[in-house]
Amino acid sequence: MFYFEEVALNIADLLEHAVDAVPERIAVVCGDRRVTFAELEERANRLAHHLAAHGVGPGSHIGVYSRNSIEALESMIAAYKLRAIAVNVNYRYVHGELRYLFDNADLVALVHERQYSDKVAAVLPETPKLKHVVVVDDGSDGDYSSYGGVDYETALAEGSPERDFAERSADDIYILYTGGTTGYPKGVLWRHEDIWRALGGGINFVTGEYVPDEWTLAEQGKSGSLVRLPAAPLIHGAAQWAAFGALFTGSPVVFVPRFDAHEVWKAVQDNKVQVLTIVGDAMARPLIDAYREGDYDASSIVAVSSHAALFSQSVKQEFLSLLPHVVITDAIGSSESGFTGIGMVSKDSDHSAGPRVNFGKDAILVDDDGALVEPKPGAIGLIARRGHVPLGYYKDPAKTEKIFVEIDGKRYVVPGDYARYEEDLTVTLLGRGSQCVNTGGEKVYPEEVEGALKSHPDVFDALVIGIPDDRLGQRVAAVIQPRSGKELDVAALEAHVRTEIAGYKVPRSLWLAEEIGRSPSGKPDYPWAQRYASEHEPVTIQPA
């Protein structure tokens, strides 16, 4: 059982408490490798001391450029132990994007997998602040000799295993860079305590109140049996937060290096995973297909949770038909807000209501002018959250002023997502306002239309966009990925969608694509959809 003298409010302190409580328990599994909490800490300590010897200290920014791995997690922990800041680097970035991020984030050190050596070698001459590089051997043959990269295991061998770091603070900074699907990525600045609290740390989920003492908090880690697998990449908040949430309570985390549906089910089976965390339909649909194709034992799973993107109703029903013993949860939120609300269904739930969530006690809806929207059925507004919210965006005061606002004397974050109150005062997420299609004065939210399209059995994935229209200003359009081996009947699809949503929301122009463009975490890439539509002929155009 966990017994601490006081509640820790710093990520590194929370992890060290778990190490002290359950040192021999497995902490992280990745492929055929596994490390205990004690081993995870020793390796993170060694890396931290190595980095400190090369000038990294409090406030320094360290890039972590890696797919999911034990080393990626160790690198983040090492940074926090030094009161430094780990910065997530998207492994899909090309030269210009890497140059921008390395410069904007003020990186002074970098830990990267060897497969990215050529990209790092090309960008380093343009980022003079970045002085020290550590390279993880991933089995590739990238050459890092030209910039003096240090082998990761050599760095660990040079560093002390001792936990002899300076005292840390709840005010230490955690940064999460956004995906950048609407422009260049931005670093969201959180205090350590705020990110922990925003994820539910030290808070009673029923009452929303802080736990009264450390003993109550300790009960969360009593059994340590809740094995979690975050399938999203660690460059995404959904995976980072799921991993830290597990480790803080002494629970094991299982990774697959990259998303492969069959590998996920193998990892679930081999490690008796109990909570599978993914990002919406983009991951759920391949998992459903792979489960049907394979012969996997998923009896250990008690919950499948989606972070950052809601499951469509059709996907929930498919999951529950295959795994009737599980609970399906949707968590809404963003890099700027943490978790804002949660919805939960099981095989006995009413599935006719649509994807709804219950707001946390600090979430409200506001109108476009920042005024409170009265909680009544049908009312639509922007999601706003107060309490433990970020400090703002790194080096972007204008964007900070726009997103972080004062309402009735309290500071709120308003990331830009619209939602609607339902009859029972749950909320339906409508989507990001910047993606809203204004067609003849009617607002159409892409996520609602995408859900209707994906409920057709021959549609695997879809993105909905607005394209110019002489009469309506914009018309609703969609790029669709048909299910493999299926010949999509466009007329039948339109007829089906008309039974799901109002006629003005039905896409008038359709494009077919072999694969829908999404971020590594599964988030929709709407700029990709716009480019695809501009470069290809549609399969159908209906009168607007």
What do these predicted regions represent?
Residues 49, 72, 93, 99-102, ...:
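AMP-binding/adenylate-forming catalytic core of the ANL superfamily
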Residues 24, 159-177, 183-184, 219-227:
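Conserved pre-ATP/AMP-binding loop-to-beta segment of ANL
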Residues 136-137, 502-523, 542-544:
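AMP-binding/adenylate-forming catalytic domain of the ANL superfamily
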Residues 36-38, 173-201, 205-208:
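Conserved AMP-binding A3 loop
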Residues 3, 7, 11, 16, ...:
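Conserved AMP-binding/adenylate-forming core of the ANL superfamily
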Residues 53-54, 82-154:
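Structural core segment of the AMP-binding/adenylate-forming
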Residues 40, 251, 269, 302-427, ...:
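Conserved AMP-binding/adenylate-forming
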Residues 197-275:
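Conserved AMP-binding/adenylation subdomain of ANL enzymes
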